[in-house]
Amino acid sequence: MAKIIGIDLGTTNSCVSIMEGNTTRVIENSEGARTTPSIVAYQEDGEVLVGASAKRQAVTNPKNTLYAIKRLIGRKFEEKEVQKDIDLMPYTIAKADNGDAWVEVRGKKIAPQQVSADILRKMKKTAEDYLGEPVTEAVITVPAYFNDAQRQATKDAGRIAGLDVKRIINEPTAAALAFGLDKQDKADRKIAVYDLGGGTFDISIIEIADVDGEKQFEVLSTNGDTFLGGEDFDQRIIDYIIAEFKKEQGVDLGKDVLALQRLKEAAEKAKIELSNSAQTDINLPYITADASGPKHLNIKLTRAKLESLVDELVERTIAPCRLAIKDAGISVSDINDVILVGGMTRMPKVQEKVKAFFGKEPRKDVNPDEAVAVGAAIQGQVLSGDRKDVLLLDVTPLSLGIETMGGVMTKMITKNTTIPTKFAQTFSTAEDNQPAVTIKVFQGEREIASGNKLLGEFNLEGIPPAARGTPQIEVSFDIDANGILHVGAKDKGTGKENKITIKANSGLSEDEIQKMVKDAELNAAEDKKKVELAQARNQGEAMVHSVKKSLGEHGASLDAGEKEKIEAAIKDLEEALKGEDKASIEEKTNTLMTASQKLGEKMYADAQAAAGAAGGPGAAAGPEAASAPADDNVVDAEVKEVKKG
């Protein structure tokens, strides 16, 4: 029987795996590598290069070499994330007739599904070369937070590549399969899969249980950001190099497509090197030229500098983790294991942040580049019937419902519901003799339908004349195991029905998803902001009071310059305290803390001298005395943290 292969279709790299008996095998490609760059190049003579060969010629053919195409799949051209990428990518992103984001290569518009299909074709061929037989069936992975449009588009890419996609499976769930299958522990375990890849971020909370000898993998919750990944980290490095080079040479490399492609390659290399070393040299001779001749680029990049450049990106992964824990109805301490997936999790800063949040060391026995493909292969074996001891229970990431009277969103299926699932509810007409009803399908967490994303709509016509509230219209929602939605409406009186499958051209952007969730919990988030601002203001005011008091007592013995610096810092902080900018208050507080260090040293020296004169050890003030808030009239208050949406 032909094998069902497992494919991790990644933003940066892709990987293919199969099951041999009960053992998984990641298959090497024709270049001998276990992962293949998700890069496709279109040559002048019509040849299509995929993987390492496409990557090698990218510098000389930037306009026709496509990478990170997964960031565009199933998205609209007008989406904010797509618009952001237009300025960053050396290739052209174009608007398709249906409003989708496509790419333009050699004067021809191509859908992201077609480009992804070229990558999938390479993975298919890799498996066929190893097995010595044709491969027609596959399980393909997607980020857990991919919406309906993105899942449909991925499935279409598989079909274009000549594959019957037996299942679309979530990447963190696949990684959990790879991790949990060989564990002999019979006790139930709750694991967090933190998946930071090339273009997307997912967090899933999964419970692994042993039920009568069968391993059950149940996803309790999932969250994420489908526009956050290694590509964004690379871009921070590229922006930094461009700024430094402009400062030194007066030339803007951002406008040079060839230079940008070289910078992209160098940034990725530097990022990888800095996971294992404290600094690296970025050396690009002949990067550009002007009237004075060729220009060479040589910049030292330290790990500390890289971490400061990407700190905000790493921090952005924590809010989804908090939400996932909350939605799973557990606390962080209930997590037994933390699994890291995706190449970006090799960065020490990421590992530190994960450890700090979960309070435990992440597991190191899972290969972050291969676990997802391995899990997909295991699921393939389950679907083929060759494996009976695994049960996988995944979830839908957002609530689904219809608009009812008064514009209300009536939720049919709530977020984090285990799939596949079906739900039906009976509705009626709002007016007398109403001949038809329009079923509008929405996705999101807001109570008012218009605040959510309209996925699609259809009519049920031919309703016999009757008083309002009399006709019985049954609306049914059906989410299949791929997370794809089918909606139907049926008049129970006449038996007439109509159905719709949500099409890929009605996708939902990650930005919209996050906005919906955030809007639904807006009040909680606003409260948290107010508390944080109050805390920052209290700390700032205490600092001003403390330093002013110390300055009055010991300022006379300071240099005039030092004293002026402290007074200026006090003035700046007092000005910031009048406003509402928490970051500015914190920054000015830290500036005053630094400026007052000399004052602290002076106080310490004065105290030592006084103690010496008194002939005893004395109780000297520490060097931080000036920086510590005075304890006059300090009231300890317990503030309950409101979880941020």
UniProtKB/Swiss-Prot annotation:
Modification type Phosphothreonine: residues? T200
Q: Which SUPFAM superfamilies match?
A: Actin-like ATPase domain (SSF53067), Heat shock protein 70kD (HSP70), C-terminal subdomain (SSF100934), Heat shock protein 70kD (HSP70), peptide-binding domain (SSF100920)
User: Can the keyword RNA-binding be found in this entry's annotation?
Assistant: no
Keywords from the UniProt entry: ATP-binding, Chaperone, Nucleotide-binding, Phosphoprotein, Stress response
What the record says about the induction of its expression is:
By stress conditions e.g. heat shock.
Pfam families attached here? HSP70
Q: Where is this region: Disordered?
A: 608-645
The UniProt entry, under NCBIfam families, shows: PRK00290.1, PRK05183.1, prok_dnaK
What name does UniProt use for this protein? Chaperone protein DnaK
Q: Which organism is it from?
A: Variovorax paradoxus (strain S110)
What gene is behind this protein?
A: dnaK
